[in-house]
Regions:
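Acidic-basic catalytic patches of nuclease active cores, encompassing PD-(D/E)XK
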Residues: 1-17
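Short, C-terminally biased terminal segments at protein or domain edges
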Residues: 86-100
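Short, surface-exposed charged micro-motifs
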Residues: 17, 26, 82-84
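Short acidic/glycine-enriched loop/turn segments that link adjacent beta-strands
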Residues: 20-23, 89
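Catalytic cores of nucleic-acid endonucleases
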Residues: 42-89
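Conserved catalytic cores of phosphodiester-cleaving nucleases, focusing on short active-site segments
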Residues: 25-48, 62
Length: 100
């Protein structure tokens, strides 16, 4: 469902459930020269700050994974995103994750 949501907004699917050694990404897409490494989370409740669903170490690992794939997919930058699902939400949360 997360991949379909991104594809509907013009992204091109690179991989689902991608693994490289100890690194793993739920979805990888690309759009306009940007490689998007996406973490998908499901929570029963919605916290005030959804970006806490992914810890900083995991964001760093996702960023490293994306950076290692840049040239292979002819992209110039990497963004790490969260797609969050909850029964309390009508639509999923989609937001960029900052590594700081």
């Amino acid at each position: 469902m997360a991949a379909e949501m991104l594809l509907a907004s013009g992204h091109h699917l690179v991989a689902k459930d991608y693994r490289m050694g100890r690194y793993q990404a739920d979805v990888i897409t690309k759009k306009d020269g940007v490689l998007f490494v996406v973490e998908v989370k499901y929570r029963k409740c919605v916290p005030q700050e959804a970006w806490h669903w992914v810890d900083p170490r995991q964001i760093q690992r996702l960023l490293f994974l994306g950076a290692s794939l840049l040239s292979e997919h002819q992209c110039s930058e990497v963004e790490v995103w969260l797609v969050g699902f909850s029964p309390e939400l009508d639509t999923p949360i989609l937001l960029p994750l900052d590594v700081n």
